[in-house]
Regions:
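Asp-based, Mg2+/Mn2+-dependent phosphohydrolase catalytic module
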Residues: 1-11, 22-23, 43, 92, ...
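N-terminal helical cap/lid subdomain that shapes the substrate entry/recognition surface
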Residues: 5-116
Length: 243
């Protein structure tokens, strides 16, 4: 893999599974179902978990684009998912729907955490005064809440959320929105993300240097977008920035 020989003047980052580790989210659903069932006679936690998984398999394809582009907010998404889950278990009480969504939201906030290599990198980038932007797909309320809960709001000079602008990765336009607000030319800007299809493909379409954060050591398949640089950890990134 090649990488740009240009000096890095600004960095763009993806959020989920690049900076935020969502591996505990399924656990938060199980815990939520335990808590909901404990307070509601007739509901079984295991059946709630099963129903919730089934609901998401059917419901997510219906609403993914709406949620990503801002036509559906995260709160409404969650309420409807729990409404369908509880109905599948014989519960039609809207107060329980609201309770379930609130319990899961709070547990989901606890489940999100930064990967271990994130804080050190951003401390170094801030010390080096590298302009930073976040480019993330998702509903505004969902993504803004993650930034607030984890204290990341002040980390970025620019934040572009697909649900706020009506454009999503891999559309090159969303990268250009961030680029237009940064004091750097595109040949000096790198985008770092975990997805070949949204991050790498989109960044390359926008003329940026695409850095694939491949934490789990996935093997690219024939025809997959090719990154300009592949790294296994964000701790590897500063070495290139410092050159």
């Amino acid at each position: 893999m090649h990488r740009s020989s240009q000096t890095v003047r600004a960095l763009l980052f993806d959020l989920d599974e690049t900076l935020l580790d969502g591996s505990r989210l399924q656990e938060s659903i199980v815990r939520a179902c335990d808590m909901i069932a404990a307070g509601q006679p007739g509901l079984e936690a295991a059946r709630l978990v099963e129903a919730n998984n089934e609901v998401w398999l059917d419901y997510w394809p219906e609403v993914a684009e709406k949620w990503t582009l801002g036509a559906l907010d995260g709160e409404s998404l969650s309420l409807e998912a729990w409404r369908r889950t509880l109905r599948a278990c014989g519960c039609h009480d809207e107060s329980i729907v609201r309770l379930a969504a609130r319990i899961h939201r709070n547990l989901g906030r606890e489940a999100h955490r930064l990967f271990d290599d994130v804080r050190e990198l951003f401390t170094s980038l801030k010390s080096a005064r590298v302009p930073l932007a976040l480019v993330t797909n998702g509903a505004s309320d969902t993504q803004r809440d993650k930034l607030r809960v984890l204290g990341m709001e002040h980390w970025f000079d620019v934040v572009v959320i697909s649900g706020e602008v009506g454009i999503a990765k891999p559309d090159a336009s969303i990268f250009r929105l961030a680029l237009n607000k940064l004091p750097a030319e595109r040949e000096n800007v790198w985008h770092v993300g975990d997805s070949l299809t949204t991050d790498v493909a989109g960044a390359k379409a926008a003329g940026l240097t695409a850095v694939w954060l491949n934490r789990s050591g996935l093997v690219r398949r024939e025809g997959d977008p090719e990154p300009d640089l592949e790294i296994r950890s964000l701790s590897n990134l500063m070495a290139f920035i410092s050159e």
